[in-house]
Amino acid sequence: DLISVKPSSNPIIDCVQSINFAAMTPMQVNTVLNQSPDKLNLIEQLIIGGAPVNSLLESKLQEVKTHCYSTYGMTESITHIAVKKLNGEYKSKYFEALPNITFQLNKDDCLVINTPHLSNSTITTNDVSKIINKESFKWIGRLNNIVNSGGIKLHPEELETKISDLFHNTRFFFSSLPDELLGERLVLVIESKNSISDLDSGLKKLLDTFEMPKTIFY
């Protein structure tokens, strides 16, 4: 049976029955977890797409029974072409290809997708990635988000994953500002009015010297 619901930030708030399969955006999953967390356990299999799943949401998903997957895809591929298990048994750091799809990298280390059943040509993305094998990859970040600081290329998304354990229910992100010496300097923005104790020592344990933010904004 197909269950139809109105578009909503919490599409299962009125749901009382078990659901075999559902699809949501990260924003919707966050809303469900904040408003009615027990409802999520009504879903057996959940795919999450439309935007990246950040480390804070992924940590919350470890507490639910639902089998959660992050999907990877784009308009050019028509639908998602890879999935990553986010929790439970077989949780993975890597996206795994759906059948008949393979991956490679271009000269900029961006993902190139081979989909012979959809197109005779490959699909080149702006997603910097690491190839595990021809059918799996690790997503690093967007090429246009790279911070070039003194000739060192830093990926904000990768750094955010590294330090996620320092932030509990606090949103944060890396960005950059112009710098006369470095070209760009790495900055960390924390969405909080209060400073976080032992943050500096925590960052030094998790980041290499060249990955340390030059400025921290609250």
Where are the model-predicted features located?
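Beta-strand->loop->alpha-helix junctions that form or flank phosphate-binding loops
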Residues: 69-76, 95-96, 175-178
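Residue-level signal for inorganic ion chemistry
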Residues: 22-25, 46, 103, 127, ...
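Alpha-helix/helix-capping structural signal
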Residues: 27, 51-52, 142
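AMP-binding/adenylate-forming core of the ANL superfamily
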Residues: 102-130, 136, 189-191
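Ser/Thr-glycine-rich phosphate-binding loops at phosphate-binding pockets of nucleotides
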Residues: 25, 73-77, 125, 149
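AMP-binding/adenylate-forming
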Residues: 1-31, 69
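Gly/Ser/Thr-rich phosphate-binding loop
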Residues: 34-90
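AMP-binding/adenylate-forming catalytic core of the ANL superfamily
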Residues: 126-211
